[in-house]
Amino acid sequence: MGVDVNGIAHIQLTVNDPARCVPFWERLCHFLGMTTLVRNEDTVYCIGGRTGILVRGAPRDATGGPFHQDRAGLHHLCFRARSREDVDAVHRFVVHELGARVVHPPEDGSQFAPGYYSLLFEDPDGIRVEVNHVPGQGHFGPGGRLGPGGAGPADRYGGEGLRGGRR
């Protein structure tokens, strides 16, 4: 017998440049309806939407090169939006208010899940952040891999070939 989790409680990100990243993340979290719980010169912790995002500066002896999503550790994080319009609103905010580097603007990603729609951008340290909307039940609904009559688990994801990075 397993346990049915209730989402992700929080994610903690360690950044090289807290002077730029802490305000970036605090503003983004506030736009996403979260509230600041902890704030100091190198840390911000925002909660809401059934999760928390904690961003803190790396200790001086642990700062390193730029973030790279293919190194061991975090690849990217993704916030689930309630509508395509919310994804579009986040896009406008990160471009016009945060000046974020957009990896891809809102686009269809139905190769990942039925109706998948997403935006991908980077924080000042290069950490990749996605905001997506998947209507209905996604993979568990009609037309989904795990829904009624679905094909079941895949060995690739959305044509990305997510089999592992070792060659």
Q: Where are the model-predicted features located?
A:
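Short, contiguous alpha-helical
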Residues: 122-138
